[in-house]
Swiss-Prot record:
Entry protein name: Tryptophan--tRNA ligase
Binding site for L-tryptophan: 136
Quaternary assembly: Homodimer.
High-level lineage: Bacteria, Pseudomonadati, Pseudomonadota, Gammaproteobacteria, Enterobacterales
Entry-linked PROSITE patterns: AA_TRNA_LIGASE_I
Matches recorded under PANTHER family: TRYPTOPHAN--TRNA LIGASE, MITOCHONDRIAL (PTHR43766:SF1)
Listed EC numbers: 6.1.1.2
Alphabetized SUPFAM superfamilies for the sequence: Nucleotidylyl transferase
UniProt cross-references to HAMAP family, sorted A to Z: Trp_tRNA_synth_B
Predominant location category: cytoplasm
Amino acid sequence: MIKKLNIFSGMQPSGIPTLGNYIGVLRQWKILQKIYNSIYCIADLHYLTNNKENSKILFKRSLDLLAIYLACDIDPNESVIFLQSHIPEHSQLSWILNCYTYFGELTRMVQFKEKIKNKKNINLGLLSYPVLMASDILLYQTDIVPVGKDQIQHLELSRTIARRFNKLHGDVFIIPEKIISKTGSKIMSLSNPNKKMSKSNLNRNNFISLLDQPYSIIEKIKNAKTDSDNPPKINFDIIKKPGISNLLSIISELRGINIKDLEISFKNKSYKYLKNEVTGAVLEHLKILQKKYFLIRKDEKYLINILKSGSKKAKKIARGTLKKVNESIGLLNF
């Protein structure tokens, strides 16, 4: 029997995920859990790098995100689902890996440079974020990491740290490989299709939340940016027609129709017609998802039990890896 490979991923509980997160991440997880030993965390420690809110908000958001995972058919019987903070080995390994990471490597991270723009006081957690991410991945002897294009640099640093450690101490860590989703890995902002759809954007018209009301979804897609071509031309061209390409990507992913086939079916159609079709596809998916979510979210005891069970499974793997790490560098295990 062929041994299943391990796959690891996670999301911060920084609010309800967007349609972009659903298409590019959560739907992929559902598929991947059938193929790999899937380990999915709620990254509440990463959340702290940018958020200093009271504990009740973080706890609520963590359970909200877990309910979203489950509503997207991430199955706790097939996948290990847990809270990052419940496994102290993440922080312990992160400290050790800090000692194998160079300051210059961290300051060169593109996301770090973006996040510190116009900020006076930069917390250390923001700088060392990629090291904690490396410990998340390496702690579970991860073979495969699904990443968006904006996370490739962080994963490459994880691989570099693992190789550096292994060179000194033997084959302690598996060197993880990446898998990148196709079109859906980057659904763009509705009002600025040159930027990724993100819930951190202050303009709520830029993104569709998975819990948006139908009237809000209709209005957001109605106002989505297209272009001024007359007559309208509905074809996929990210450079020349980013708005149209984004709408085509959304309907392609949700309806499972090839982009080329969509271009043929939308030939000589208006932009209004395209937007109506996209709206229908989004409403169709989110109606089902929201019904599941609100049913699951009501049962807080059930959600907490899932996290407890997942933590036990995750801790068993994490302890084994940290024991191996400690022994390799001379830290005593009793």
